[in-house]
Structures are given as structure tokens and as C-alpha cells.
């Protein structure tokens, strides 16, 4: 965890090396926020997908007769989990390319 925090601070630290304007500071914070937010969303999505797959496999092992229903429900759950990550990606791209604070 310390390594991850040090890595994130090192990525943001280059912006403070020289005199920068307010716009450059907003850009650097936007990049850092987008990277951190997308990383957290991807990590949470991966954990959620793993739990969904494990629960489906466990349910199929207990009752093989309903494996078709469980599989369909799992695919819907995986699509909803992945949609959350895609929404975070869209917000990160908006923060990077259409930032309202830069206009």
C-alpha cells in the first residue's frame, strides 16, 4: 500500500517542480483524478465480477439443473458491473478533454 501511495504521489509530483499556471495545475489534477478514479473503478469491477462468477459456479455445483438461469443472470450482472467501469471511463475522458474548468 505504501508503494502504491508513493507511486501516485510520484506521478503527480512532477507538476510541482516548476512554476506553473493555474490551468496547468488543473490539467495535472484532472489527469491524476482520472487515473486514480479509473483504477479504483476497474479494481472494484474486477472484484465484483470475480464474486459474481464464484457465486454462479457455486450455485451450478449445488444444483446443475438451473445452470442456464444462473448463467443468464450472471451475464446480466457482469454487464451491469462493466457498465459502471465504462461510466467512470467516460467521466475520466470528459475530465481530460472537455474540462469545464479550463474554458
UniProtKB/Swiss-Prot annotation:
<keyword id="KW-0472">Membrane</keyword>
<dbReference type="InterPro" id="IPR020537">
    <property type="entry name" value="ATP_synth_F0_csu_DDCD_BS"/>
</dbReference>
<dbReference type="InterPro" id="IPR000454">
    <property type="entry name" value="ATP_synth_F0_csu"/>
</dbReference>
<protein>
    <recommendedName>
        <fullName>ATP synthase subunit c</fullName>
    </recommendedName>
</protein>
<keyword id="KW-0375">Hydrogen ion transport</keyword>
<dbReference type="Pfam" id="PF00137">
    <property type="entry name" value="ATP-synt_C"/>
</dbReference>
<keyword id="KW-0406">Ion transport</keyword>
<comment type="function">
    <text>F(1)F(0) ATP synthase produces ATP from ADP in the presence of a proton or sodium gradient. F-type ATPases consist of two structural domains, F(1) containing the extramembraneous catalytic core and F(0) containing the membrane proton channel, linked together by a central stalk and a peripheral stalk. During catalysis, ATP synthesis in the catalytic domain of F(1) is coupled via a rotary mechanism of the central stalk subunits to proton translocation.</text>
</comment>
<keyword id="KW-0997">Cell inner membrane</keyword>
<dbReference type="InterPro" id="IPR005953">
    <property type="entry name" value="ATP_synth_csu_bac/chlpt"/>
</dbReference>
<keyword id="KW-1133">Transmembrane helix</keyword>
<keyword id="KW-0813">Transport</keyword>
<comment type="similarity">
    <text>Belongs to the ATPase C chain family.</text>
</comment>
<keyword id="KW-0446">Lipid-binding</keyword>
<keyword id="KW-0138">CF(0)</keyword>
<comment type="function">
    <text>Key component of the F(0) channel; it plays a direct role in translocation across the membrane. A homomeric c-ring of between 10-14 subunits forms the central stalk rotor element with the F(1) delta and epsilon subunits.</text>
</comment>
<feature type="transmembrane region" description="Helical">
    <location>
        <begin position="30"/>
        <end position="50"/>
    </location>
</feature>
<dbReference type="InterPro" id="IPR002379">
    <property type="entry name" value="ATPase_proteolipid_c-like_dom"/>
</dbReference>
<keyword id="KW-0812">Transmembrane</keyword>
<keyword id="KW-0066">ATP synthesis</keyword>
<dbReference type="GO" id="GO:0046933">
    <property type="term" value="F:proton-transporting ATP synthase activity, rotational mechanism"/>
</dbReference>
<dbReference type="GO" id="GO:0008289">
    <property type="term" value="F:lipid binding"/>
</dbReference>
<dbReference type="InterPro" id="IPR035921">
    <property type="entry name" value="F/V-ATP_Csub_sf"/>
</dbReference>
<dbReference type="GO" id="GO:0005886">
    <property type="term" value="C:plasma membrane"/>
</dbReference>
<feature type="transmembrane region" description="Helical">
    <location>
        <begin position="3"/>
        <end position="23"/>
    </location>
</feature>
<keyword id="KW-1003">Cell membrane</keyword>
<feature type="site" description="Reversibly protonated during proton transport">
    <location>
        <position position="82"/>
    </location>
</feature>
<dbReference type="GO" id="GO:0033177">
    <property type="term" value="C:proton-transporting two-sector ATPase complex, proton-transporting domain"/>
</dbReference>
<feature type="transmembrane region" description="Helical">
    <location>
        <begin position="74"/>
        <end position="94"/>
    </location>
</feature>
<dbReference type="GO" id="GO:0045259">
    <property type="term" value="C:proton-transporting ATP synthase complex"/>
</dbReference>
<dbReference type="InterPro" id="IPR038662">
    <property type="entry name" value="ATP_synth_F0_csu_sf"/>
</dbReference>
<comment type="subunit">
    <text>F-type ATPases have 2 components, F(1) - the catalytic core - and F(0) - the membrane proton channel. F(1) has five subunits: alpha(3), beta(3), gamma(1), delta(1), epsilon(1). F(0) has three main subunits: a(1), b(2) and c(10-14). The alpha and beta chains form an alternating ring which encloses part of the gamma chain. F(1) is attached to F(0) by a central stalk formed by the gamma and epsilon chains, while a peripheral stalk is formed by the delta and b chains.</text>
</comment>
